[in-house]
Regions:
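Extended substrate-binding grooves/exosites of carbohydrate-active enzymes
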Residues: 1-143, 148-153, 157-169
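Compositionally biased, intrinsically disordered or flexible polar/acidic segments
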Residues: 450-495
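Extracellular Ig-like/FN3 beta-sandwich strand-entry sites
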Residues: 153-157, 200, 268-270, 349-353, ...
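Serine/threonine-rich, repeat-prone extracellular segments and beta-strand-based repeat modules
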Residues: 329-367, 403-447
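Beta-strand-rich structural segments
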Residues: 95-99, 161-162, 198-216, 222, ...
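Short, hydrophobic beta-strand segments
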Residues: 147-153, 247-266
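Short S/T/G/P-enriched beta-strand
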Residues: 64-94, 100-101, 170-202, 206-215, ...
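Short aromatic-acidic-glycine turn motif
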Residues: 114-129, 181-186, 225-242, 293-295
């Protein structure tokens, strides 16, 4: 029943206690304390690391107490535009800094992309406390093992500058307000694995905004596909209340993150994981698999190169150096010479590859370039009743050739009239999309005198909707949406 800080202080200050174990380091399936019997809780909540292997904030508390390497970790995230639930003293948010430094200066800058610290919000400092047995510890005068600030919420960037006892900066951390989710970003713990049919690469998927900042409230459904010498053996997001399958090719993000575990086969080569999500730009990552006898060698097997997206008629900037991946798992920067790219390649939407060479290997470097442009405007649809003159939407959705979707303001050629909604009919109105040329928006208004509420998930004897399951148990899965609710054995369909 103790918090992490309370438990550690109690053990720390007793000279006869040599250390502390925590229960648990990792979350695990089962024992969802205190939510026993509360669907959909399925795993523990008290681990310092979740089931996907992502560190929670409390992980950094232990790091601040047990690590000698300078560190500071800020929490919470900084996306609270429409959330007053954690505010204190009216409109302020309690910001923690876990650190093993002596003090922390907290700065605020409204520009998330600025390299400047901005204005000083405040400073909090530890006092050095003698534990009474030849050991000293840092804690605040109130006895806290973290530093804290009360900060008025405004979108922007908070930066923590941690300093030692001499006032010298030794660590830094920051949290930024994320904008709308725009793309997926994949990173692998290892991009070179053994081709033995059992080695694993753990690939993290981040949902990020246009600046590359993780969107902390993103829960997009992400689909995965593997090509080449590997297969997906597990997916997760660390959410203790998620009942999604671990063996699947899709997963919803939790707080902007998900995990895919890919297993190599027994053939040396490579595999590519591609992640897609509706409305977001796609990403992929290539992992190389090598024979076990080659894992001690220092040979280039491939390169870690990020795909590039540029607007139509934009400037293509290729890197002078790329990251080489070696058979022993190490990485290194090597210079690359790229082929010439004709200017007309950038004049229209599409995708093409650019090839480069390095002096260190005969293996070519390849980067995929997407020339991004709007390829269509989704029709807007409005349903209304007779004599009900509704307001037309103020925005429409533009679809790009990279799969992303953006909303744009629209000016309709006209508004709905009384005549439009006088009788049952369908009315189509076009509009001009702000910032888009050559494409018109369209809203389709259906005027009806018949409205009927219907549960479209219920099967009423037709072929669809059809229920299915990945595991066939004793119960008939088709009973789940036959419209019959059974709380006992009459009728005996258990749904």
């Amino acid at each position: 029943g103790k918090t992490a800080e309370e438990a550690w202080k109690r053990d720390r200050d007793r000279g006869y206690i040599s250390g502390e174990y925590i229960w648990t380091g990792f979350d695990y399936i089962g024992e969802p304390t205190p939510y026993y019997g509360s669907y959909p809780a399925k795993s523990s909540y008290f681990g310092a690391i979740d089931t996907a292997g992502f560190p929670k904030d409390i992980y950094y508390f232990y790091q601040s107490q047990w690590s000698s390497k300078p560190m500071v970790h800020l929490l919470p995230h900084w996306n609270f535009e429409n959330d007053d639930s954690i505010k204190v003293d009216g409109d302020k948010i309690l910001v923690y800094a876990y650190t093993n430094a002596n003090s922390v200066d907290l700065y605020y800058n409204e520009d998330v992309n600025s390299k400047e610290l901005g204005e000083l919000v405040g400073t909090d400092t530890y006092e050095v406390t003698n534990a009474g047995y030849n050991k000293s510890y840092k804690e605040t005068k109130e006895g806290k093992l973290h530093l804290e600030f009360k900060v008025q919420y405004k979108p922007g960037k908070l930066t923590a500058v941690a300093k030692d006892k001499n006032g010298k900066e030794i660590a830094r951390d920051e949290v930024k307000t994320a904008k709308e989710a725009k793309k997926l970003n994949l990173t692998a713990d290892r991009q070179v694995v053994k081709a033995n049919g059992s080695d694993l690469s753990y690939i993290t998927v981040d949902v990020v905004d246009e600046n590359g900042t993780i969107v902390p409230n993103a829960d997009n459904l992400i689909n995965f596909e593997v090509s080449g010498n590997g297969k997906i053996v597990g997916v997760d997001n660390g959410n203790a209340a998620s009942v999604e399958r671990y063996k699947d090719n899709k997963r919803k993000a939790d707080h902007g993150k998900a995990l895919v575990i890919v297993q190599s086969d027994s053939n040396a080569g490579s595999f590519t994981l591609t992640a897609t999500s509706e409305g977001l730009s796609t990403d992929n990552i290539k992992v190389y698999s090598v024979n076990e006898e080659d894992t001690d060698k220092m040979e280039i097997v491939g390169y870690d190169v990020n795909d590039i997206t540029v607007p139509v008629n934009g400037k293509l900037e290729l890197q002078d150096k790329v990251t080489a991946l070696y058979s022993n798992g190490s990485k290194g920067e090597v210079a690359v010479t790229w082929e010439e790219v004709p200017s007309d390649k950038l004049s229209k939407a599409g995708t093409f590859k650019v090839t480069g060479t390095t002096k260190e290997s005969n293996i070519p470097v390849e980067v995929t370039v997407t020339v991004k442009d709007i390829i269509g405007i989704l029709d807007s649809r409005v349903l209304t009743g007779i004599n009900d003159k509704v307001e037309l939407p103020k925005e429409v959705s533009a679809i790009f050739n990279d799969g992303s979707i953006e909303n744009h303001l629209v000016t309709w050629d006209r508004e709905l009239t009384d005549e439009d909604v006088k009788s049952v009919k369908t009315v189509e109105i076009e509009g001009t999309v702000e910032g888009v040329s050559g494409l018109k928006a369209k809203v389709i208004v259906t005027v009806s005198d018949k409205f009927k509420m219907k549960n479209i998930a219920v099967n009423e004897g037709q072929e669809f909707p059809k229920a299915f399951t990945s595991y066939e148990g004793a119960d008939n899965i088709n009973n789940i949406n036959d419209g019959v609710i059974s709380k006992n054995n009459s009728p005996q369909n258990r749904w």
